[in-house]
Amino acid sequence: MKNAFKDALKAGRPQIGLWLGLANSYSAELLAGAGFDWLLIDGEHAPNNVQTVLTQLQAIAPYPSQPVVRPSWNDPVQIKQLLDVGAQTLLIPMVQNADEARNAVAATRYPPAGIRGVGSALARASRWNRIPDYLHQANDAMCVLVQIETREAMSNLASILDVDGIDGVFIGPADLSADMGFAGNPQHPEVQAAIENAIVQIRAAGKAPGILMANEALAKRYLELGALFVAVGVDTTLLARGAEVLAARFGAEKKLSGASGVY
């Protein structure tokens, strides 16, 4: 079994991604052909469930873009279900400390290395037990990315990086800026300093730093600092802003977004 996304991170090859929030397999397949290295299927803030994640994994599968799935929480039951339908790379939100990072890793591993329940006869991941020796290969194919999104998590970054099985650490600029007192302003100098320091620390520890940033100059800056998986846009934003621009060309009143920063 292989995980092309995990292999790319290990090799130090920067991976450029796009966030998927439309919760739709048709749009997921459309974007899978756009040329991004990875696509994030969002189960935290988008209206996804296990079934809609499954259909998007199926839609993306024929294309080179690699799927990354974000569950709504660091929940072993939800993680088990997502792995069974075929997710190999998970982005676990709001991890605050090393214990929570260890719990995330354990949820992705079969015993004795972890606590993932064995149900491979029912699982797309094992091709319903058609993959020889799946139970002994699956653990090594898992890629666990954890999100640090608060000052507490930042203060615990060194211990999080020491956890075996953590492949990458994703910095959540929207939540981090809010926690630091600068909600809606991830470009504040204090937030940017925290992000840049974290990227350097993560890379120095031999892990892959990641982030979502639609600002092109900042995204490129993070890549220069050593970020290895960077999402540079969101499908809902691309659709909404693109539609507004087109309508405005034909006289429609431009609807100004009140949001700023990351997306």
Curated annotation (Swiss-Prot):
The residues annotated as the active site are H45 (proton acceptor)
Q: Which GO terms describe its biological process?
A: 4-hydroxyphenylacetate catabolic process; phenylacetate catabolic process
* Record's keyword annotation contains Protease: no
Site Increases basicity of active site His: give positions. Answer: D84
Keywords of the record, alphabetical order, are: Aromatic hydrocarbons catabolism, Lyase, Metal-binding
In which residues is a divalent metal cation bound? E149, D175
Specify the domain of life of the species encoding this protein.
Bacteria
Q: Site: Transition state stabilizer. Where?
A: R70
List the cofactors. Answer: a divalent metal cation
Report the EC code(s) recorded for this entry: 4.1.2.52
Residues bound to substrate are: Q147, A174, D175
Q: In which pathway does it act?
A: Aromatic compound metabolism; 4-hydroxyphenylacetate degradation; pyruvate and succinate semialdehyde from 4-hydroxyphenylacetate: step 7/7
Q: Which GO terms describe its molecular function?
A: 4-hydroxy-2-ketopimelate aldolase activity; metal ion binding
Q: Which Pfam families match?
A: HpcH_HpaI (PF03328)
For this protein, the record's InterPro entries field holds: Aldolase/citrate-lyase_domain, HKHD_aldolase_ent, HpaI, HpcH-HpaI_aldolase, Pyrv/PenolPyrv_kinase-like_dom, Pyrv_kinase-like_dom_sf
GO cellular component annotations, sorted alphabetically? cytoplasm
What reaction gets catalysed by this protein? 4-hydroxy-2-oxoheptanedioate = succinate semialdehyde + pyruvate
Role description: Catalyzes the reversible retro-aldol cleavage of 4-hydroxy-2-ketoheptane-1,7-dioate (HKHD) to pyruvate and succinic semialdehyde.
* Family the UniProt entry places it in: Belongs to the HpcH/HpaI aldolase family.
Name used for this protein in its record: 4-hydroxy-2-oxo-heptane-1,7-dioate aldolase
- List the source organism: Salmonella agona (strain SL483)
